[in-house]
Amino acid sequence: MSVLTSLLLRGLTGSARWLPVPRAKVHSMPPEVELGIMEKAIGLTSCFVSLFLPAGWILSHLEDYKRPE
């Protein structure tokens, strides 16, 4: 890296060092009611189905997309 490039980069990032970073005031507490095994299983199953079912459908019909009509 040339001297000019390093000076230019230092000049561009120098002013950003003094900007205040906003901090989120988020405080968390333990849940009032623990999730049961069945609720966790239903949640994970619905996440997997919603992600993998459309992807599987597209992959299984990939040849249909390749055919010229």
From Swiss-Prot:
One of its GO terms (biological process) is mitochondrial electron transport, cytochrome c to oxygen. Signal peptide: none annotated. It is a single-pass membrane protein. In response to mitochondrial stress, the precursor protein is ubiquitinated by the SIFI complex in the cytoplasm before mitochondrial import, leading to its degradation. Within the SIFI complex, UBR4 initiates ubiquitin chain that are further elongated or branched by KCMF1. CDD domains: Cyt_c_Oxidase_VIII. Keywords: Membrane, Mitochondrion, Mitochondrion inner membrane, Transit peptide, Transmembrane, Transmembrane helix, Ubl conjugation. A motif (SIFI-degron) lies at residues 2-19. The chain crosses the membrane at residues 37-60. Component of the cytochrome c oxidase, the last enzyme in the mitochondrial electron transport chain which drives oxidative phosphorylation. The respiratory chain contains 3 multisubunit complexes succinate dehydrogenase (complex II, CII), ubiquinol-cytochrome c oxidoreductase (cytochrome b-c1 complex, complex III, CIII) and cytochrome c oxidase (complex IV, CIV), that cooperate to transfer electrons derived from NADH and succinate to molecular oxygen, creating an electrochemical gradient over the inner membrane that drives transmembrane transport and the ATP synthase. This is Cytochrome c oxidase subunit 8A, mitochondrial. It comes from Macaca silenus (Lion-tailed macaque). The lineage of its organism: Eukaryota, Metazoa, Chordata, Craniata, Vertebrata. The gene is COX8A.
